[in-house]
């Protein structure tokens, strides 16, 4: 008897993802990765999503102050095996050390687009007319 698959991550996947995110952040903050691109860039890790078997960790990163994110993400993926090895001391409780993959985090861009839409004259006009009708 199998359990139906769900698209939502389990509590364990969320907890392990947060632990992996914190461990990757520590590795990058300590400057353990010797790469000119990575050392010169401030990198924000917004989320780490784990596969259901906890063997693959996909880290969503945003390089700050860099116009071309792909260069930084390629550098991180080149050093993914080294970073995976450095996660060991912080994630001793895990049976398998997850393979780390880095992806560009586009959620900040989506938030920016939504904010621009909400501040557009058309939407603000509609919001003003709704508040005027509520007052009557």
UniProtKB/Swiss-Prot annotation:
Asked whether the UniProt record includes Cell inner membrane among its keywords, one would answer no
Give the keywords, sorted: Cytoplasm, Ribosome biogenesis
Q: InterPro entries, from UniProt?
A: KH_dom-like_a/b (IPR015946), RbfA (IPR000238), RbfA_dom_sf (IPR023799), Ribosome-bd_factorA_CS (IPR020053)
Its main localization is cytoplasm
Task: Work out whether the entry's keyword set contains Cytoplasm.
Answer: yes
Which GO biological process categories is it annotated with? maturation of SSU-rRNA
Q: Name one Pfam family in it.
A: RBFA
Subunit annotation: Monomer. Binds 30S ribosomal subunits, but not 50S ribosomal subunits or 70S ribosomes.
Please name the HAMAP family in this protein's record.
RbfA
Function comment: One of several proteins that assist in the late maturation steps of the functional core of the 30S ribosomal subunit. Associates with free 30S ribosomal subunits (but not with 30S subunits that are part of 70S ribosomes or polysomes). Required for efficient processing of 16S rRNA. May interact with the 5'-terminal helix region of 16S rRNA.
**What protein family is recorded?**
Belongs to the RbfA family.
Protein name from the UniProt record = Ribosome-binding factor A
């Amino acid at each position: 008897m199998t359990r139906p698959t769900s698209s939502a991550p389990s509590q364990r996947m969320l907890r392990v993802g947060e632990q992996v995110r914190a461990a990757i952040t520590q590795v990058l903050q300590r400057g353990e990765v010797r790469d000119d691109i990575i050392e010169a860039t401030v990198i924000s890790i917004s989320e780490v999503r784990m596969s259901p078997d906890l063997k693959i960790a996909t880290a969503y990163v945003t390089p700050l102050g860099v116009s071309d994110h792909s260069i930084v993400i390629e550098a991180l993926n080149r050093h993914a095996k080294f970073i995976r090895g450095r996660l060991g001391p912080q994630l001793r409780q895990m049976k398998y050390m997850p393979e780390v993959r880095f992806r560009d985090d586009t959620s900040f861009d989506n938030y920016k687009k939504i904010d621009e839409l909400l501040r557009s004259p058309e939407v603000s006009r509609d919001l003003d007319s709704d508040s005027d009708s509520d007052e009557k």
